[in-house]
């Protein structure tokens, strides 16, 4: 099981998966001892570099106010863009939207430029996948989100806009946390030579994250399983 996920699981997540697969109830301390005895260790996340955002055009208050829970799907969405470097020095940018109810990635887009269209495409995909959603939509103060055209998109679905305070990345904590997970469990483990190679790996990882990566806070389920369980209740 450890090799199946390329060594990304620590003892707590390994405990969830062992118990789920074997229908047992092993204590996490026992799994920790077993993993330690055979030198199994999870990959460690790297720290994120933060940048100062200047001269926004349209801003909003921090309506979310670090209330990182939601009672139902599509109640609160978080978004952000992160950067990847290819082996030849070129860059790629991933935009994603995370639902706070189940921590699922409801939409994402990968591009060669960090521009408005990347963010617009991500938002449009989320709306198409979740018709009728009117979420609280939280982001940082990046220029794509302070764009008047993006504000019009939010108004078009009657979404409430919320923004992190300047320099306070913790205001978007779960989104930042997802970037850390994705990079430590996928990106930092290998080199990517082409944009297409990176895109394939990201597609595979987000599918894994949404459908097979069990989370204790989701009652031991993967994000989409927890989401679907709520939708049919």
What name fits each language-model region?
Residues 66, 70-106, 112-113:
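An active-site-proximal beta-strand-loop segment
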Residues 7-11, 27, 60, 74, ...:
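Hydrophobic (often cysteine-bearing) scaffold residues that line and stabilize catalytic clefts
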Residues 1-72, 168, 222-230:
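Basic, flexible linker segments flanking DNA-binding modules
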Residues 155-159, 181-233:
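C-terminal domain-tail junction helix/linker
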Residues 14, 31, 35, 64, ...:
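Mobile genetic element proteins and their domesticated derivatives, centered on retroelements
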Residues 53-55, 139-141, 147-150, 163-183, ...:
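RNase H-like two-metal-ion nuclease catalytic core shared by retroviral integrases
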Residues 102-108, 161-164, 188-189:
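Short small-residue beta-strand/loop micro-motif enriched in glycine and branched aliphatics
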């Amino acid at each position: 099981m450890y090799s199946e996920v390329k060594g990304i699981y620590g003892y707590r997540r390994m405990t969830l998966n062992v118990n789920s697969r074997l229908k047992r109830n092993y204590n996490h301390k026992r799994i920790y001892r077993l993993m330690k005895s055979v030198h199994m260790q999870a990959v460690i996340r790297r720290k994120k570099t933060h940048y100062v955002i200047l001269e926004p055009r349209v801003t909003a208050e921090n309506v979310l106010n670090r209330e990182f829970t939601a009672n139902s799907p599509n109640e609160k969405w978080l978004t952000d863009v992160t950067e990847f470097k290819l082996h030849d020095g070129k860059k790629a940018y991933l935009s994603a939207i995370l639902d706070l109810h189940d921590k699922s990635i409801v939409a994402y887009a990968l591009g060669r430029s960090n521009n408005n269209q990347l963010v617009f495409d991500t938002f449009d995909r989320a709306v198409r996948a979740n018709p009728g959603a009117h979420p609280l939509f939280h982001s940082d103060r990046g220029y794509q989100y302070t764009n008047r055209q993006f504000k019009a998109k939010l108004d078009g679905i009657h979404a409430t806009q919320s923004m992190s305070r300047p320099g306070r990345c913790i205001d978007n904590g779960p989104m930042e946390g997802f970037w850390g997970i994705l990079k430590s469990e996928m990106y930092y483990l290998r080199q990517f030579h082409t944009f297409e190679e990176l895109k394939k790996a990201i597609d595979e990882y987000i599918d894994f994250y949404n459908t097979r990566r069990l989370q204790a806070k989701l009652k031991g389920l993967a994000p989409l399983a927890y989401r679907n369980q709520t939708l049919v209740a």
